[in-house]
Curated annotation (Swiss-Prot):
Changing residue 23 to E: 2-fold and 28-fold decrease in affinity for Torpedo AChRs. In homodimer alpha-cobratoxin, selective reduction of Cys(26)-Cys(30) in one subunit does not affect the activity against the alpha-7/CHRNA7 nAChR, whereas its reduction in both subunits almost prevents alpha-7/CHRNA7 nAChR recognition. On the contrary, reduction of one or both Cys(26)-Cys(30) disulfide bonds in the homodimer considerably potentiates inhibition of the alpha-3-beta-2/CHRNA3-CHRNB2 nAChR by the toxin. It is found in: Secreted. One of its GO terms (molecular function) is acetylcholine receptor inhibitor activity. The record marks 25, 27, 29, 33, 65 as: Binds to both neuronal alpha-7/CHRNA7 and Torpedo AChRs. Changing residue 29 to A: 12-fold decrease in affinity for Torpedo AChRs and 74-fold decrease in affinity for neuronal alpha-7/CHRNA7 AChR. It comes from the Eukaryota. This is Alpha-cobratoxin.
Length: 71
């Protein structure tokens, strides 16, 4: 499977059986810059924690960098 990986946001091969993920969360600059984003691949979908959104998928390049909605 191929997944987008941060910080370069490039598509890279991940080991067999892995899933792609997109993890987003707010930090001190969230209202100005938007949510922080981490893209990658993992053996299993990362555990969800309070304040962190995680989406996992299992097709090539299914985790593109999310677009920020403009007001």
């Amino acid at each position: 499977i191929r997944c987008f990986i941060t910080p370069d946001i490039t598509s890279k091969d991940c080991p067999n059986g892995h899933v792609c993920y997109t993890k987003t969360w707010c930090d001190a600059f969230c209202s100005i810059r938007g949510k922080r984003v981490d893209l990658g691949c993992a053996a299993t979908c990362p555990t969800v924690k309070t304040g962190v959104d995680i989406q996992c998928c299992s097709t090539d390049n299914c985790n593109p960098f999310p677009t920020r909605k403009r007001p």
